[in-house]
């Protein structure tokens, strides 16, 4: 896999922190799992970390929700412990048997699906850190863009929420600065993530597990679009080669149609 070989080259004898940005259902977790197996065959030890692992505790998110009811679901900027993430990434650069790192882990099934932290994972080595998330590396944009934002940012309260989450992105920039490289999974149409989420729920329910209805899924996904709309936030990121190293274009079946470097489109 050329991507795994590229990651090995990027490492250069020090711990590499590689970000993977992808919306819901784009396959970022699957990609991280595949890369972990391939890199292991190359004798590289991998630590997988999700932005979800940095969620604030259940108790802290309850307080946030009471203070600001708009944060009814975990996920948007403001629901994570950024200082924890910074500390963990910095420690992972120095990890060794003499300096083990407690990597945070999050269980989404706790508290009737609200989720909470569980016992951290103790690591003593990491050649590569695969850090993935639905808005990893995303930067604040000009607030004026929300004056004529795409659906479902429709009402004035929608625009206010979008501006507020845009402001909160500023708190995440120190975390993004820890990334050595960033890969973006970019679907041909961001609205495909809604379809993919529905498919995932249907598969989960087919195994006997509880899942959301189509209406609930639409409300859930649109909540994320209101907080950080892909049409507003992704194009500016992709246009800046100093922020993105590889872009993987995905078709409607989540299959890659193109893999390229924005600063060297001929490299694939």
Label each residue range with its predicted role.
Residues 1-19, 23:
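Extreme N-terminal, non-catalytic leader segments
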Residues 13-14, 123-125, 177-178:
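Short loop/turn elements that form and flank the Walker-type P-loop nucleotide-binding site
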Residues 28:
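Conserved lysine of the Walker
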Residues 31, 35:
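Hydrophobic positions on the alpha1 helix immediately C-terminal to the Walker A/P-loop
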Residues 37-47:
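Post-Walker A helix-loop "phosphate-sensing" segment adjacent to the P-loop in P-loop NTPases
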Residues 47-50, 54-110:
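Conserved nucleotide-sensing/catalytic segment adjacent to the nucleotide-binding pocket
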Residues 90-138:
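Phosphate-binding/switch loop-helix module in NTP-utilizing enzymes
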Residues 135-268:
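Conserved NTP phosphate-binding and transfer environment spanning the P-loop NTPase/kinase superfamily
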